[in-house]
Regions:
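Cysteine endopeptidase catalytic domains of the caspase/legumain-like
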Residues: 3, 10, 15-246
Length: 246
C-alpha cells in the first residue's frame, strides 16, 4: 500500500531520487489538430492541449512521449502505448492523454478514414489488460468522448470490469469546447490547473479521483454554461490518489 501511494505521488511531486530507481511514471500525450485528407476536420488547440499536459508531466518524469498531428497515426499511437505498457512494472503509473476528434468507439488519429483507423476502447482495454502497472489513467479532451463509456455506467467510480480510470471531457451527445482566450480546450485547461493543485479541496497535498472530478466538472460546466459535462468511470475508489503536491 505504501509503495502504491508513493507511485501515485510521483505524478506531480518531486520525490527523492532513491524512489525514482524503483518507481516510474510513463506518459503518452497525443494532440491532433489536422487530419490527413480531411481539411474540414481541422481543430485549433488540440496540439497545444497535449503540449500543456506534457509540459506539466515533464517536470516530474522523463518518460513523456508526445505525438502531434502527422506523427499521431493509429499505428504510431498504438505502438507507443504498447511499448509503454510493456515497460511498466507493478508499482509504476501509465497515463494516456488525448486531445482531438472523438468517434463513437474511441479517438480519431491523424490518418482517420471516416470512423476507421482510430484508437478504440477495445484497443486500449487490450493493451492495459496486459500491462503490469496497477495504476492506469486515460484523460481525453474530445467531442462525444462519453460514448467511450459502456452504457449504463454512471460518472464517478463506476464499473467493475475496467482496470483503468477514464476521465473524459464530455457526455456522449456533447461537443468539447475550445477557449480562444486560453488557447486550450476548456477541459484540458482546468484538468492541468486542477492537477497542479487547484483541485486539492481539503488542502492535504493529495488530489484524489473524486477531487479532480468535482473540480474539473464544476469549472467546465461553469465555463461552458452547462453545455459540457465531463464524465469519469472505471474500477477505482473515490479516494484513489491521482496527484501528490509538495
Amino acid at each position: 500500500m505504501k509503495k502504491t501511494l508513493l507511485s501515485l505521488c510521483l505524478l506531480l511531486s518531486l520525490l527523492p531520487m532513491r524512489l525514482l530507481a524503483t518507481t516510474e511514471v510513463y506518459v503518452v500525450a497525443v494532440g491532433v489538430n489536422t487530419y490527413k485528407g480531411e481539411p474540414g476536420m481541422s481543430l485549433n488547440f488540440c496540439r497545444q492541449d497535449a503540449m500543456k499536459f506534457a509540459s506539466m508531466m515533464l517536470t516530474q518524469t522523463t518518460h513523456v512521449t508526445t505525438l502531434y498531428d502527422e506523427q499521431a497515426t493509429r499505428r504510431a499511437v498504438y505502438d507507443k502505448l504498447k511499448q509503454v505498457c510493456s515497460l511498466a512494472d507493478a508499482d509504476d503509473v501509465v497515463i494516456f492523454y488525448y486531445s482531438g476528434h472523438g468517434m463513437p468507439s474511441g479517438f480519431c488519429c491523424h490518418d482517420i478514414v471516416y470512423t476507421q483507423t482510430g484508437l478504440t476502447y477495445t484497443d486500449m482495454q487490450s493493451l492495459f489488460k496486459g500491462c503490469k502497472a496497477k495504476n492506469k489513467m486515460v484523460y481525453a479532451d474530445s467531442c462525444y468522448s462519453g460514448k467511450l463509456r459502456p452504457s449504463g455506467r454512471r460518472s464517478g467510480s463506476a464499473g467493475k470490469k475496467s482496470p483503468v480510470m477514464f476521465f473524459l471531457s464530455s457526455r456522449s451527445n456533447e461537443t468539447s469546447i475550445e477557449m480562444k482566450e486560453k488557447q486550450n480546450g476548456v477541459f484540458t485547461y482546468y484538468l492541468v490547473k486542477g492537477l497542479s493543485g487547484a483541485a486539492d479541496s481539503n488542502h492535504d497535498k493529495f488530489i484524489t479521483a473524486k477531487e479532480i472530478f468535482h473540480y474539473v466538472s464544476y469549472q467546465v460546466k461553469q465555463a461552458s454554461r452547462q453545455r459540457q459535462h465531463p464524465v469519469m468511470w472505471g474500477k477505482f475508489a473515490d479516494d484513489m490518489i491521482v496527484a501528490c503536491l509538495n
